[in-house]
Amino acid sequence: MLDEIAYRGPAGRAIVEANGATMGVVWTEPQSDSFSDLIAESLVRDAGAEGHLAEAQATSEGLTLVRDQLGRAPLYYGQMDDDTLCFASEVKAMLEATHDVNEVPPGHRYDGKKMKAYFHLKKKRPIKGSTEDIAHELQRRLADSVERRVSESGKLVGSWLSGGLESSTMAALARPHVDKLYTFAAGTPNAPDLEHAREMAEFIDSDHHEVIVTFNEMMDALPEVIYHLESFDALLVRSSITNYLVAKAASDYVPAVFSGEGGDELFAGYEYIKSMDIEDLPDELIDITNRLHNTALQRVDRSSAAHGTIAHVGFLDPDVVDYALRIPSDMKLHDGVEKWILRRAMDGLLPDSILDRTKSKFWEGAGVGEQLSQYAE
C-alpha cells in the first residue's frame, strides 16, 4: 500500500505494529523526536499543519480513524475479505486490498463499527464591533495562523501565488517570518495571474518563480493530474492542471507552501453570492465550506502530495474559521464588494491593485480555460 503513495512521503517511511494492527506511514521531511512519540502511542498521522490531520491509532479496543474538522487531510477506509479494516490517504493505495472503499467524512471518528461526528460547522451569533476592530482581529488571527505554519515548516516555506486576494494574503503574512520567501505562479503566456503575481512578488520582495504553461504541456500533464486527483470531474480536473504544475516547480525549492483556499468560502467571494438575500448568506457559506474537502482541498492536497510537499491552508485554521463565521454578513458582502472585510483587514499589507482585484476562476486567471475549451470542441 505504501508503494502506491510513496510520493506523499519521499523523506522516509515506517511500519508500526501494535495492538494487533499494522500501520504504515510516509513523511515529507526528516522526522524529529516527536515521531518517536507518535510511534510510542501506536499512532500514525497524515498532518498538513495544526488542526489539519488524518490520524489512525491502534488501541487494545481496536483501530480508530479520525479526520480533521474540514477534511484538509484525506482519509479512506474499507473492509477486506477477512473483515480486516484497512485505511489510506488515497484510494489507489487500497485497491489491491479491497474495493470496499469509503471516505471518513470531515469532523468524524470511525472505530471500525460506528462512524461518529465530533464536529459540525454551525451558524454563530454575529459579533458586534466597529469595522476597524473586526478587521484588526481578523488580520491578527490570520497572521497567527500563518506564523504557526511557518514555524512548523522550519522557516523553509513558499507560497503558491496567483496574485489574487487570498494567495497574496498568505504570502504577505508569511514574508516577515522568513529570510527568503519563495513564491510560485503558473499560467499560459500573458495570463492575468502571472502579471498580478509578479506585482505582488515585487511588493513583498519574494524569490519569485514562474511556470509558463503551453497547451502541449497541459495535455502531457493531464493523465498524471487525473491519476493523482482520483477524479474525472471536469471542473476539478481543469482547475488542477496549473496547480499540479506549479506544485511540481515548488517542490524543487521548499517542502511546504501556502495556499489561499478557504477565503472565498468564508468571506463570500463567489459572484453568484451577490444575487442572494443577505439573510441566506451564513447558511450558504457554511454549506460551501463543508464541501471543500471534495473540491478545492482535494485539488490542493493531491497537487502538493504528488510532489512530496505539504500545502498549508492558513484560512482554514480553526481559530480563523471560528472568527470568520461570526463576522456579520454585511461586512463580507458590502455594497456589492465581495470579501470586503478581508480587504479591509489586509489594507496596507497588499498593493491597492491586489486589494481591489475582483475574483477570477482559477483556470481563467491562469489562462487555461480557453485553451481547454477549444480542445474539447
Where are these regions (language model features)?
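Short, contiguous acidic/charged loop-to-helix segments that flank catalytic cores in large enzymes
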Residues: 129-133, 161, 187-189, 234-237, ...
